[in-house]
Curated annotation (Swiss-Prot):
Keywords: Ribonucleoprotein, Ribosomal protein
Single GO term (MF): structural constituent of ribosome
InterPro entries given in the database record: Ribosomal_bL34, Ribosomal_bL34_CS
Protein name (record): Large ribosomal subunit protein bL34
Length: 45
């Protein structure tokens, strides 16, 4: 039997999909801008 692929880890989640990571690149800032435009309740992990 193989284990489940999703092994929750808050630190890894923040480091790979977090707000500060999104702000780091131009593309990431574009993602945040589009999510703000859509009116998302949460912008990032």
């Amino acid at each position: 039997m193989s284990k489940r692929t999703f092994q929750p880890n808050n630190r890894r989640r923040a480091k790979t999909h977090g707000f500060r990571l999104r702000m780091r690149t131009r593309a990431g800032r574009a993602i945040l801008a589009s999510r703000r435009g859509k009116g998302r309740a949460s912008l990032s992990a």
